Amino acid sequence: MAIHLVIIDALNLIRRVHSAQPNQDDIQAVITTTTRTINKILKETEPTHIIAVFDHHLQDRGWRAEILPQYKEDRKPMPEALQKGMDDIQEAWWKLGIDSLLSDGDEADDLVATLANKVAMHNEQVTIISTDKGYCQLLSPTLRIRDYFQHRWLDAPFVEKEFGLKPEQLADYWGLAGISSSKITGIPGVGPKAALEILTQFPTIEAANESEDLPKKYRKKFDEHYETAILCRQVAGLRTDIELGFNLQDIRYEKGTRD
């Protein structure tokens, strides 16, 4: 039987639903809305296997902050009411047949990437439900990303239109241009336009740095900040080697509600 694994970036979905609620303390409304959303996702995707991946609630920013100490240092904590209601949300999703994977210090992005990559490498279909463009670097013929809220696929044509690059160049792009929302600096003075120019001419940061054809206007910046670009690329990238502790059979989707 063909496999179709659906991975829900749980907090990505929940936070968007929560922020749209008139009463931010009304967790029952969040449960009701996310349950309705999940049912629509199930109908649209028809998964054989499904799991919701949750970030840990702690302020520990993980291995990325060890490389770039400023990484997400100003991120806002989860609203207290939402944090207290997380168990109830997970319970409601469990009744729909969806198990939760809770990270223990790892960012959800890396757990999603590890599971998605592992299954896609066996030529099985994987759909990630998320608005996070960072997952686009994982794209492959059997791995796709669905932005549920914008009703669009974050696929290779989307990456080409949005960035002008191939999915496999995105980590290099962010290594050069940075990601301001996560405090990933990139190379100072190299913004999106310059990063695109460089990566249109060269496939990687290393190739650009090693080439005598790198435009002079960028040579000094590379000489001064090359190592920073490499570190920023690493932080913007996704790990696919996290120990998950379960197998695919454990997350098989069985239609119907659990008691």
Curated annotation (Swiss-Prot):
Q: What is its EC number?
A: 3.1.-.-
Q: What does this protein do?
A: Has flap endonuclease activity. During DNA replication, flap endonucleases cleave the 5'-overhanging flap structure that is generated by displacement synthesis when DNA polymerase encounters the 5'-end of a downstream Okazaki fragment.
Q: What's a single GO BP term from this record? A: DNA replication, Okazaki fragment processing
Instruction: Quote the record's binding site residues for K(+).
Output: L176, A177, I187, V190
The UniProt entry, under Gene3D superfamilies, shows: 5' to 3' exonuclease, C-terminal subdomain (1.10.150.20), 5'-nuclease (3.40.50.1010)
Q: Hey, which family's this protein in?
A: Belongs to the Xni family.
Q: Which cofactor does it need?
A: Mg(2+); K(+)
Q: Record keywords: Metal-binding included?
A: yes
Which Pfam families does the record match to this protein? 5_3_exonuc (PF01367), 5_3_exonuc_N (PF02739)
What's this protein's name? Flap endonuclease Xni
Cofactor note text: Binds 2 Mg(2+) per subunit. Only one magnesium ion has a direct interaction with the protein, the other interactions are indirect.
- Record keywords: DNA-binding, Endonuclease, Hydrolase, Magnesium, Metal-binding, Nuclease, Potassium
Annotated region (Interaction with DNA) at: 189-194
At the highest ranks, the source species' classification is: Bacteria, Pseudomonadati, Pseudomonadota, Gammaproteobacteria, Vibrionales
> What region holds the 5'-3' exonuclease domain?
165-255
CDD domains, alphabetically?
Answer: H3TH_53EXO, PIN_53EXO
Cite the GO molecular-function annotations of the record: 5'-3' exonuclease activity; 5'-flap endonuclease activity; DNA binding; magnesium ion binding; potassium ion binding
Question: What is this enzyme's class at the first EC digit?
Answer: hydrolase
Which InterPro entries does the UniProt record give? Answer: 5-3_exonucl_a-hlix_arch_N, 5-3_exonuclease, 5-3_exonuclease_C_sf, DNA_polI_H3TH, FEN, HhH2, PIN-like_dom_sf, Xni
SUPFAM superfamilies, A to Z: 5' to 3' exonuclease, C-terminal subdomain, PIN domain-like
